[in-house]
Amino acid sequence: MTFITILIIVVFVVGYALIALESATHINKAAVALLMCVACWTLYMIHPADYLPGVTTDLLSSRINTIIEEHLGSISTTLFFLMGAMTIVEVVDQYGGFNFVRDTLKTQSKRGLLWRVVALTFILSAILDNMTTTIVMIMVLRKLVRDHSDRIIYASLIILAANAGGAFSPIGDVTTIMLWNVGSITAAGVIEELLIPSAISIFIPTLILQYKLHGALVEPDASTEETAASVLSGWQHKAVFVLGVGGLIFVPIFRYLTDLPPFVGILLVLAVLWTVTELFFRLSKRAKTAGDMGKRVSQLLGRVDMSTILFFLGILMTVACLEEVGVLTVVGQGLDHTFHGNHYLVTGFIGVLSSIVDNVPLVAGCIGMYPLQEAGAFAIDGVFWQLLAYCAGVGGSILIIGSAAGVVAMGLEKISFGWYARHISWAALIGYLAGIVSYYLLRTFVF
């Protein structure tokens, strides 16, 4: 390991610590992530020949630019997907589209609401992606829970439920999509064998953390729920909901049919929804006194939390730098050597690691390191691949910045890293380990 590589690791550790201590330093995590990203890539440029053997000096600059653009292009698909999904959910919410979901979940019991929210999130995240599910559920939650100290508990369990629900579905999480696309797992296999472990991984933390909630709910003020829905008819409200939520469900189908990245599907849904709502406002006589629809949508676009987007950019580009200098590969090889090929320990540790760094390069590294075999743990639907799908997905819940769902909730509900680590992480870890144990028992005695 070169001196430059060590410096890059030090920058990552220091930056990560500052992000974790945001509540103490009062420095926005997005600013730290961007500084960390630039510092790592600048260090990389000091002596790039160490990481690009065989590339001549006159071609180094061009090659590095290509590498950075490739990573940025890949990461941008996630960022545009997030921006599109957040805007769609905001539009649906403005038209009162989530009111019937709110009415379905409504109860006076705080703990009763928690179980309903967790169950719905778990189911939705198997169909939608984790980020979209988290955004939708938090928007609904804001209509039900006024107290922010209670709401961040609900939001934290939404993170856990979204990641758990995505782990047993071939389209529920980006890592399971990766494993499914390369043929490491099958849809039937991963659903059949990971459904119970995933359910256990969220059931136990919910059972534990429900005791943080006491008393009855106080409904939010009705005045805070004034939306654009007031100028539209009942069927138009329902049409907006069907187009918005149905469109989100359609995104993975669109991806399967066209092989285009998911963000293209999200942009399609946003474009259709935007066009339809403008037509509704144009046809509505009441809308003429309620403001211009174009202005409304422009305002909604302005509500996208750019600090969350930039935080994503900084973190993912930093991890890309760690990937380029070979740190993730070394970690993977070290794990295999340390745990002597014990798949439960290797994948279990990868899951814990995925709560610190992005799970996508970790899973990509594993796919590259361990080729498919005809039989054994590395066969299709083998123990290693199914455990990897579970651990990389659910393990990201241990720390709030370990998953896209966590980062989104962190930005939307202003949950601090420290608060989550103190109040949620330990319960998430217990659920995570319980899921692994249940998978072992099922694999040993049932399947």
What are these regions (language model features)?
Residues 40-50, 72-73, 124-161, 165, ...:
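Membrane-interfacial helix-loop connectors
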Residues 73, 95, 102-104, 117, ...:
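Transmembrane helical segments that form the transport core of multi-pass membrane transport proteins
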Residues 6-15, 26-58, 75-87, 237-247, ...:
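Hydrophobic mid-bilayer segments of alpha-helices in multi-pass membrane transport proteins
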Residues 73-83, 189-205, 258, 262-271, ...:
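Alpha-helical transmembrane segments
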Residues 43-70, 86-103, 123-135, 321, ...:
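Transmembrane alpha-helix boundary signature
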Residues 4-7, 147-152, 168-169, 178-179, ...:
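Juxtamembrane and boundary regions of transmembrane helices in multi-pass small-molecule transporters
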Residues 6-9, 34-35, 79, 114-119, ...:
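Hydrophobic alpha-helical transmembrane segments
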Residues 1-4, 24-27, 56-76, 187-196, ...:
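Interfacial loop-to-helix junctions that mark the boundaries of transmembrane helices
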